[in-house]
Amino acid sequence: MAPLLNSEAFQKVKSFMESGNYPVMINGLSDSGKSYFINGIYEESDKPIVVVTHNDIEARNIYEDLSFYLPNVYYLPSREIVFYNIDAISGDLRWARLKVIKEMLRSTKKIIVTSIDAFAATYTPKELYKSHILKIKVGDEVDFKEISHKLIESGYERLETVEGKGEFSLRGGILDVFPPNSANPFRIELFGDEVDSIRTFNVESQRSIEKVKRAEIFPAKEVILSKETIEHAIEKMRKELSDFENKVSDKEIKERLRKLIERNIESLQENWSFETIDSYLPFFFDKPATLFDYLNNYTFIIDDAKRCKGK
C-alpha cells in the first residue's frame, strides 16, 4: 500500500479531494487497480465511501476485491436482482439490502458498493424508516400490542413459532422476534409491563443462547406503510388509472393495465405489499427518499461514469 500512497498520482488525487475540488477524473486503471486505488482513498480519508458501478455484476466484483483488503465493505444489490431470482436467493438478497440500509444509518467508516440502478432508485423517507427501528432494553416499560402493530407495519409476519428472519410471535408476556439484522432471534419477557429479560435463542431447538441487555429491531422490509398511507395510495392509483384510460383508446392496453393495478391494490389491501411496490413509492409518499438522503458526508466514486450515465 505504501508505494501507492506515496505515488505522485495518488498524492495529486488526495490533494484535490482535501481541497474539495470535485469531480476528480482518474483514467488508465485496471480492474484490480481500481480496487487497490479505492482502498488507498479509504485508508487516507476519514469519510465513508460509496462506489457506484454501471451494473450489479461489476459492483459485486469490486465488492469482493475490496473485501479481500478491508473488513467494513458492503454490497447493495439492485431491486431487479431481488425480484427476478428464485425465492430462496431473492430472500437472501432482501436481507442483504436491509443489512446495508442499516449500515447506511450508522455513522461509521465503511465502503458501500452498488450499481447505478440501485443508486437511482427511490426509498422510504429516512425519518419514517428510522421511526420504525425498535430499541428495547431490560427495565423498559413497553406495550406489546403497540410493538406488535409496529412490527406488522415494518414487514414482520406474526406466526405461532419464529423460524426465520422477518417473523415474530406473541404469547402472553413473551415476544419472540427475528430481525433481519441479527444472527439469532430475540426472546423478550415481561414482568407486568416491564422488560424482565432479553435473550437470544436458537430457532431449531428454541433454547436460549445468551442473555443480553438490549435488542435493536430493524424493519423487515424497505417500504414502510401505514393504513392511512395505503388508503391514500390506492386512491391515487385509481385516479391515475382513470386518467390513463381517458387518454388511451386501445382497449387491450387499458384492460391489461386495469388488471395489473387492481391485482396490486388487492395484494396491498390483504398483505400491505406487492412485488414491484418500490416502483409505486410516489403514490405513497409525496417526496420519496433517494440514497443521497441516507448517505450524508460520503465520498462518491463513480466507476466508468460514461456507462453509468448511459443507464
Language-model region placement:
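ASCE RecA-like P-loop NTPase motor cores
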Residues: M1-K311
